[in-house]
Amino acid sequence: MTNRMELSGTIAKPPIRSKSPGGIEHCRFWLEHRSTVIEADLPRQVYCRMPVVVSGLRSQAITQNLVQGSNIKVSGFVAYQTGRNGVGKLVLHADNITQI
């Protein structure tokens, strides 16, 4: 099975940094993506907003320059996460972030 995603866009809200009770660093933010793709030989406008999380020892190093409005390319894996309110969503767990 393959679970790999790459998405570019703009950081829509200021990143939130936190530490879990186990001492693991996390950085969370929303990535807003807009593009045009060809589907069925026709151009289609694409828009999505996806939550991104970066965890672990590298999180501080790869997120230290991120601010709201930064244009970035993110790669990682996607996982389903259920919030405290019971609503589920897909989250991109990033292992690489590049400023563009």
Swiss-Prot record:
Query: PROSITE patterns, from UniProt?
Result: SSB
Q: Would the keyword DNA-binding be found if you checked this record's keyword annotation?
A: yes
Task: Please indicate if the UniProt record lists NADP as a keyword.
Answer: no
Note the Pfam families from the entry: SSB_1 (PF22657)
Entry's Gene Ontology BP terms: DNA replication, synthesis of primer
Instruction: Drop me one GO molecular function for this one.
Output: single-stranded DNA binding
Q: Which UniProt keywords apply?
A: DNA replication, DNA-binding, Primosome
Q: Which GO terms describe its cellular component?
A: primosome complex
Q: Which residues form the SSB domain?
A: 1-100
Instruction: Report which superkingdom the organism of origin falls in.
Output: Bacteria
Q: Which family does it belong to?
A: Belongs to the PriB family.
User: Subunit arrangement?
Assistant: Homodimer. Interacts with PriA and DnaT. Component of the replication restart primosome. Primosome assembly occurs via a 'hand-off' mechanism. PriA binds to replication forks, subsequently PriB then DnaT bind; DnaT then displaces ssDNA to generate the helicase loading substrate.
Q: What does this protein do?
A: Involved in the restart of stalled replication forks, which reloads the replicative helicase on sites other than the origin of replication; the PriA-PriB pathway is the major replication restart pathway. During primosome assembly it facilitates complex formation between PriA and DnaT on DNA; stabilizes PriA on DNA. Stimulates the DNA unwinding activity of PriA helicase.
Question: What's this protein's name?
Answer: Replication restart protein PriB
